[in-house]
Amino acid sequence: MAYPFQMGLQDATSPIMEELLHFHDHTLMIVFLISSLVLYIISLMLTTKLTHTSTMDAQEVETIWTILPAIILILIALPSLRILYMMDEINNPSLTVKTMGHQWYWSYEYTDYEDLSFDSYMIPTQELKPGELRLLEVDNRVVLPMELTIRMLISSEDVLHSWAVPSLGLKTDAIPGRLNQTTLMAMRPGLYYGQCSEICGSNHSFMPIVLELVPLSHFEKWSASLL
């Protein structure tokens, strides 16, 4: 969950988000080292006579500034590719939920059940109860079992949308006529908030997403009460 004046990313709730946080720290450290090196060279140029205006050929330097960036790019690309393949890998999901984007609400269908579907609208500010979050609460939450692999099928009925839940490391485009898929697995119970992350019209800011992750026994009771 995000909070005011937050400087970092949201706490990771899924294995994918933990990997993304590690990759973020890894890349940020590389950027910090490069920036420090550049600032050090600039300071030397300003404070000493570190100039080579008459140099016509420097093969050693050219070799270094060719090989060193290549090594840095490899150090960034390899962990990035690993995470990309992890995000695309879906093996034997325990549950499949189909998500459809509309202007300006979400609809959900639990495809493993015969008749379990609903629409999810934002609760207007004037109808919020004490303690509820402005522009983030919905009338129907998406209840899911924790510690299980869940496949999300995402599409749109009208324009481009994007289904995003930051604490789970999820962001998948909802494209009309195309069915995208992603996977999630939450390690802790709780409420996880997200929003539409693709500008989709005048009420784009009013398309929140709320996932309620509960133990499997609670999920079975909830689904049985709706069937």
UniProtKB/Swiss-Prot annotation:
One of its GO terms (biological process) is ATP synthesis coupled electron transport. Binds a dinuclear copper A center per subunit. It comes from the Eukaryota. This is Cytochrome c oxidase subunit 2. GO terms for molecular function: copper ion binding; cytochrome-c oxidase activity. It is found in: Mitochondrion inner membrane. The gene is MT-CO2. Belongs to the cytochrome c oxidase subunit 2 family. Residues 1-14, 88-227 are mitochondrial intermembrane. Component of the cytochrome c oxidase, the last enzyme in the mitochondrial electron transport chain which drives oxidative phosphorylation. The respiratory chain contains 3 multisubunit complexes succinate dehydrogenase (complex II, CII), ubiquinol-cytochrome c oxidoreductase (cytochrome b-c1 complex, complex III, CIII) and cytochrome c oxidase (complex IV, CIV), that cooperate to transfer electrons derived from NADH and succinate to molecular oxygen, creating an electrochemical gradient over the inner membrane that drives transmembrane transport and the ATP synthase. Mg(2+) binds at residue 198. The keyword Translocase applies. Cu cation A2 binds at residues 196, 198, 200, 204. PROSITE patterns: COX2, COX2_CUA, COX2_TM. Component of the cytochrome c oxidase (complex IV, CIV), a multisubunit enzyme composed of 14 subunits. The complex is composed of a catalytic core of 3 subunits MT-CO1, MT-CO2 and MT-CO3, encoded in the mitochondrial DNA, and 11 supernumerary subunits COX4I, COX5A, COX5B, COX6A, COX6B, COX6C, COX7A, COX7B, COX7C, COX8 and NDUFA4, which are encoded in the nuclear genome.
